[in-house]
Amino acid sequence: MPFRSELWTEVKDFKFQDLTYHRAKEQGTVRIAFNRPEVRNAFRPQTVDELFTALEHARTTPDVGVVIITGNGPSPKDGGWAFCSGGDQRIRGKDGYKYENSERGATQKMDLARLGRLHILEVQRLIRFMPKVVMAVVPGWAVGGGHSLHVVCDLTLASEEHAVFKQTDPDVASFDSGYGSAYLAKMVGQKRAREIFFLGRNYSAQEAFDMGMVNAVVPHADLENVALEWAREMNSKSPTAMRMLKYGFNMVDDGLVGQQLFAGEATRLAYGTEEAQEGRDSFLEKRPKNFSKFPWHY
């Protein structure tokens, strides 16, 4: 999946070390890419901080409708490709993943409350609740926490030649009992989801597609072009409709939080009606409200 730099402009508001962040020149799409190919794009706390920052920036940029999450490559060690291989096990402590001295400076005092966090879960929630389409573009390995990350995205495109899906949580005494497993079961069924976690086998892009957890299998060389074409199509849609559709899809699985998000957006839409304006104006003008001209729709 060659990165076609001529199609993108770097977002220079940030100084990321573990990610690259670009915006498409001809559409409202951003590309957030893990940039640790030498370790299969495994994430450390700094990586997750940067990912959250980039996603939040994309969320609050009003002319961006689609967010692509992918992984840079290939690895300088063996030429392999990866989306993300989950948490870097070398820095996992007894209560989570640790910031390294080099990440914050050996002399800088660390806030103890930041230590030992599983804040990749905060990233999952941001992806889930973001009122925009988040698309995983998987050029290679999607493993462990990286597998869960693609699961929580709205769509997944996968490299025909290099994508591998694998859940290693039980092998390293970890488990994602939230979106990474329960939402996966909604996609592929309970039996297949349990197989994926309990056995930890490798699945090709085609096998993942056949199960229902991948939207399209794409030749590796075409992956970025296809992702941009999908993004272009989605960016041409009504932003309000896309937002409400995402929240509607999510609501059945997200309990009262999902209901609140959907209802909040519905309330905001209602504020734009003449009926809502009559309610507001009658209050401000201190007169009796008159909703008689508004029908009880059926």
State what each model feature region is.
Residues 1-12, 262, 270, 275, ...:
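Intrinsically disordered, low-complexity segments enriched in small/flexible residues
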Residues 1-77:
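Conserved CoA-thioester-binding segment of acyl-CoA-metabolizing enzymes
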Residues 71-123, 173:
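Glycine- (often His-adjacent) and acidic-residue-rich active-site loop
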Residues 78, 158-163, 175, 214-261, ...:
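C-terminal long alpha-helix characteristic of the crotonase
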Residues 122-129, 137, 143-197, 211, ...:
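CoA-thioester-processing core
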Residues 155, 195, 199-201, 207, ...:
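Well-ordered beta-strand positions
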